[in-house]
A protein has these predicted regions:
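Segments forming oxygen-rich coordination pockets for charged ligands
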Residues: 1-126
Length: 126
């Protein structure tokens, strides 16, 4: 997903008052679907736009995002899928590394910052 697509989704959800979570990959080890800096948005209804894995982590991230929104507190998650015996995460689809993801709430009470300002600057940088 491109940055512009992510921003369009953000603007759409924000205009409808949807609380959301910005999930950012901040570290990886080994083979992972995405690398540091990759982001997805997760809505309060567990809808998400983008992927940080080949589909093996997004469901869990959506559940964690719900807790992040309830507490209005960020959360750092580590998913270690390097153990071949761990079929829960790896699923044999290229998710056999370690990935660390930072989840931060984007809510109306703080004007969806810091992503609101980032989106504004990116959309006007042409």
């Amino acid at each position: 997903m491109s940055a512009r697509e992510l921003i369009r989704t953000f603007e759409s959800w924000r205009s409808s008052g949807e609380p959301m979570v910005l999930a950012t990959v901040y570290d990886t080890v080994g083979s992972t679907y995405s690398k540091a800096g990759h982001r997805i948005l997760i809505a309060s209804n567990a809808d998400y736009q983008g992927l940080v894995s080949g589909g093996c982590l997004e469901g869990d991230l959506a559940e964690r995002a719900h807790a992040v929104l309830e507490l209005n507190e960020p959360l750092a998650m580590t998913y270690d899928m390097r153990d071949e015996a761990d079929d829960l995460w790896g699923l044999g689809i290229g998710c056999n590394g370690l990935i660390r993801v930072f989840l931060q709430p984007l809510v109306a009470v703080n004007n969806y910052e810091p992503f609101s300002e980032i989106a504004k600057r990116l959309m006007t940088s042409d």
